């Protein structure tokens, strides 16, 4: 009798995706982040669902409903901080996952990569809208500043902003619709992640060498299921440590003050995972230019496959490209630091130089270096 795992219509999909899937024998722990992102998404959906049971999306009661969750709901504080810090873990895994893709040339799987870029945008939109929901000072002013950026779009800008607000300022209508979108988007993300996996399994995984691994495949289970479980345990260890010891480490104290449209906080800044893009936005004096740079800072990922000039896929055997990759990482860390600093000397010029370097590295320096490496190998 044939195994039910291979014949049942539902089971065989799971089987071919997580059990009998032929996987390269040499993929390192950098390939763990896909499963970790899946775990993060599940944690966020579950904690978010329980938070939504007690949250009210009304400007008068939103802040106090979050306080009520933390004070009166059984383990409400735990659910709330798991959700808030779970978002940070989500983005750490996302950045490492994208970094892995850039380093090892995984972007050569075009459909998988482009859906990944779309997923990144969707997760960023979800996180932004989620940050507005507690209706603290930074929630309100963050929503005001970021939505206002759309007014830079010629001709339709101001109408578009008022349409998104549902009025003439960020108010009850804005909060209600942000809650609705924040609730639905994770399910769209889950569906997109399924499509992301579907396209990945059409080609099979890449591996650190960037060479074909068809000659040497091993089954996903038990080898990579065990390996992924180790990653999940480490993720849970870091997340619970963060939640139980310093839950507000990555948050902003201003968000513990209820939203007040008449009082602007001294430094309006987003959550830490948006700071690099925020620094790029602020480094351009022109409003429309800043908005374009902000969008391009993420959208540039979609153009990476077009900028691949090397004859090799991975950076494993390309020392010059490796150096540039780590300079890019350092540049992004610098931008993240600058995004959290006030707009004054010397931070302005550092931010502008780091922003220029970011685009120069990706668009010019790395492709030229790849051509140079081809010549060194007489290719």
From Swiss-Prot:
Positions of heme b b562 binding: 83, 182
Keyword Ligase: no
Membrane topology: Multi-pass membrane protein
Compartments, as annotated in UniProt: Mitochondrion inner membrane
Cofactor binding mode and count: Binds 2 heme b groups non-covalently.
Stored InterPro entries: Cyt_b/b6_C, Cyt_b/b6_C_sf, Cyt_b/b6_N, Cytb/b6-like_sf, Cytochrome_b, Cytochrome_b_C_euk/bac, Cytochrome_b_N_euk/bac, Di-haem_cyt_TM
Binding site for heme b b566: 97, 196
Matches recorded under PROSITE patterns: CYTB_CTER (PS51003), CYTB_NTER (PS51002)
Residues in the signal sequence: none
Ranges annotated as spanning the membrane: 33-53, 77-98, 113-133, 178-198, 226-246, 288-308, 320-340, 347-367
MF terms (GO), sorted A to Z: metal ion binding; ubiquinol-cytochrome-c reductase activity
Binding positions (a ubiquinone): 201
One BP annotation, GO: mitochondrial electron transport, ubiquinol to cytochrome c
SUPFAM superfamilies: a domain/subunit of cytochrome bc1 complex (Ubiquinol-cytochrome c reductase), Transmembrane di-heme cytochromes
Cofactor annotation: heme b
Keywords: Electron transport, Heme, Iron, Membrane, Metal-binding, Mitochondrion, Mitochondrion inner membrane, Respiratory chain, Transmembrane, Transmembrane helix, Transport, Ubiquinone
Self-association state and partner proteins as the record states: The cytochrome bc1 complex contains 11 subunits: 3 respiratory subunits (MT-CYB, CYC1 and UQCRFS1), 2 core proteins (UQCRC1 and UQCRC2) and 6 low-molecular weight proteins (UQCRH/QCR6, UQCRB/QCR7, UQCRQ/QCR8, UQCR10/QCR9, UQCR11/QCR10 and a cleavage product of UQCRFS1). This cytochrome bc1 complex then forms a dimer.
Stated family: Belongs to the cytochrome b family.
Miscellaneous field: Heme 1 (or BL or b562) is low-potential and absorbs at about 562 nm, and heme 2 (or BH or b566) is high-potential and absorbs at about 566 nm.
Protein name: Cytochrome b
Organism: Parablarinella griselda
């Amino acid at each position: 009798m044939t195994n039910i795992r291979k014949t049942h219509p539902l089971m065989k999909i799971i089987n071919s995706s997580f059990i009998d899937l032929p996987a390269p024998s040499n993929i390192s722990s950098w390939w763990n982040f896909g499963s970790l992102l899946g775990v993060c998404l599940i944690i966020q959906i579950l904690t978010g669902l329980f938070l939504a049971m007690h949250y009210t999306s009304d400007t008068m009661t939103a802040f106090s409903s979050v306080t009520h969750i933390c004070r009166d709901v059984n383990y409400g504080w735990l659910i709330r901080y798991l959700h808030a810090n779970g978002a940070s873990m989500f983005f750490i895994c996302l950045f490492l996952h994208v970094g892995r893709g850039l380093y090892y040339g995984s972007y050569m799987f075009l459909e998988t990569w482009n859906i990944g870029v779309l997923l990144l945008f969707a997760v960023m939109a979800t996180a932004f809208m989620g940050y507005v929901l507690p209706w603290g000072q930074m929630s309100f002013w963050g929503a005001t500043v970021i939505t206002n950026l759309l007014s830079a779009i010629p001709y339709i800008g101001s109408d578009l902003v008022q349409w998104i607000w549902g009025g003439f300022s960020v108010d009850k209508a804005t909060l209600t619709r942000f809650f609705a979108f924040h609730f639905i988007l994770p399910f769209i993300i889950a569906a997109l992640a399924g499509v992301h996996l579907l396209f990945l399994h059409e080609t099979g995984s890449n591996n650190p060498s960037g060479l074909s691994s068809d000659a040497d495949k091993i089954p996903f289970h038990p080898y990579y299921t065990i390996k992924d479980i180790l990653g999940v345990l480490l993720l849970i260890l870091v997340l619970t440590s963060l939640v139980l010891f310093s839950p507000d480490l990555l948050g902003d104290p201003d968000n513990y003050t209820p939203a007040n449209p008449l009082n602007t906080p001294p430094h309006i800044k987003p959550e830490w995972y948006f700071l690099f893009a925020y620094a790029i936005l602020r480094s351009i004096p022109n409003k429309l230019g800043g908005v374009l740079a902000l969008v391009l800072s993420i959208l540039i990922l979609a153009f990476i496959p077009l900028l691949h000039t090397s004859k090799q896929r991975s950076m494993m055997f390309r020392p010059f490209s490796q150096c540039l990759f780590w300079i890019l990482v350092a540049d992004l860390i610098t931008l993240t630091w600058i995004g959290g600093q006030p707009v004054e000397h010397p931070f302005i010029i550092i931010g502008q130089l780091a922003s220029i370097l970011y685009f120069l590295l990706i668009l010019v320096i790395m492709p030229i270096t790849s051509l140079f490496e081809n010549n060194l190998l007489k290719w």
